[in-house]
Design a protein with these regions (language model features):
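N-terminal leader/targeting and pre-domain segments
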Residues: 1-15
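C-terminal binding/interaction regions
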Residues: 86-122
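Short glycine/proline-enriched loop/turn "hinge" motifs that connect secondary-structure elements
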Residues: 13-17, 69-71
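Small-residue-enriched alpha-helical segments and adjacent helix-cap loops
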Residues: 2, 20-60, 65
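Solvent-exposed alpha-helices and their adjacent loops that cap or buttress functional pockets
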Residues: 14-16, 55-56, 79
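Iron-sulfur (Fe-S) cluster-binding segments and ferredoxin-like electron-carrier domains
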Residues: 29-50, 74-94, 101
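Short, intrinsically disordered low-complexity segments
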Residues: 56-75, 83
């Protein structure tokens, strides 16, 4: 049974107003796509920039740290939904472009795009 506490937690992280959700492969149990430290640097940068830009929480961008996104090379790897855009080499400079161009402006960053497929076939 879903509790009121869970509903409040979802609201507090911005689920009701989310426009996009970025998952970043980092902090892996067994690092494969990149060194563990490299992934954690990318994660820390992503968290900091989304907060600085007012995009986290009620800002419409959800972020999730993933243990593994199953593309075990060229990492850190990220995926942005609802567009289903998969990105490689997601170090801070690339993440900055993804934040500015994709998360804010809605344009896929083709230079780092591995593959794109919107779920549901739309």
């Amino acid at each position: 049974m879903i509790t009121e506490s869970q509903t409040r937690a979802a609201a507090s992280i911005g689920v009701p107003v989310a426009r996009r959700h970025i998952f970043l492969c980092c902090d892996q149990t067994t690092p494969k796509c990149c060194e563990k430290e490299r992934g954690l640097v990318a994660w820390d940068f992503l968290k900091k920039r989304l907060k600085e830009l007012g995009l986290s929480d009620e800002g419409g961008i959800l972020r999730t740290k993933a243990n593994c996104l199953r593309i075990c090379e060229g990492g850190p790897v990220a995926v942005v939904y609802p567009e289903g855009a998969w990105y490689g080499e997601c170090d801070p400079p690339v993440l900055e472009r993804i934040i500015q161009e994709h998360l804010i402006e809605g344009r896929v960053v083709r230079e780092y795009l591995i593959e794109q497929h919107r779920l549901g076939g739309a």
